[in-house]
A protein has these predicted regions:
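Short, small-residue-biased leader/transition segments that mark boundaries at the very start
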Residues: 1-7
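Alpha-helical transmembrane segments and their helix-helix packing motifs
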Residues: 11-183
């Protein structure tokens, strides 16, 4: 039937892990050679998108009394920022760290990788700070009579008070998930 023919044409081929890595490595070659201003703009966008995910998760979870449910809701909403990054092709530092695979395979130099990572890191930082400023000016933190602002400060303080080992381990686990998403 015509409907089954359309379905057959739309089938997606699943890549093996080896094929996925090869595709990613080839994509890294173009990424490290991208002009700095383009990388920077794409990185600003990614920083804003991740900040949108964080802000959305805070809005969704800030007034939920049950801590487990609040964390579940925040955990469901936050990845929307990462999905926006992946779907738009924006540049996120955590995912770009995976470009070291192409460096190891000598597809580009370590200097090009470091340049890209610095540009993307600074762009992500600027993008996230820009969105945070916009959130502040918009009065979003006054939502629920200031409860959202207090919740945001509580989350930030919790992260700032992590000991180095815990923060490092959490960062590594987070980066594994981000790298899996961008592959």
């Amino acid at each position: 039937s015509a409907a089954s023919d359309v379905y057959k044409r739309q089938e997606l081929k699943m890549l093996s892990m080896k094929e996925a890595i090869e595709n990613y490595v080839e994509g890294c070659v173009g990424k490290v050679d991208c002009p700095a201003y383009k990388l920077f703009m794409k990185a600003i966008l990614a920083g804003m998108m991740i900040a949108f995910g964080a802000a959305g998760s805070s809005v969704a979870a800030h007034d939920i009394v049950n801590v487990g449910i609040a964390r579940l809701v925040a955990g469901v909403v936050f990845p929307m920022g990462l999905m926006m990054v992946v779907m738009t092709g924006a540049e996120l530092f955590t995912g770009d760290c995976l470009a070291i695979m192409a460096t190891v395979q000598k597809k580009h130099t370590a200097l090009k990788l470091i340049r890209m990572l610095i540009v993307v890191y600074l762009g992500n930082l600027l993008g996230s700070l820009m969105l945070t400023c916009i959130d502040y000016v918009s009065g979003q933190y006054n939502y629920s009579s200031g409860i959202l602002g207090a919740y945001t400060i509580k989350v930030a303080l919790g992260k700032c008070n992590l000991d180095f080992t815990t923060a490092l381990a959490s960062g590594i686990l987070c980066n594994i998930l981000v790298c899996a998403a961008v592959m």
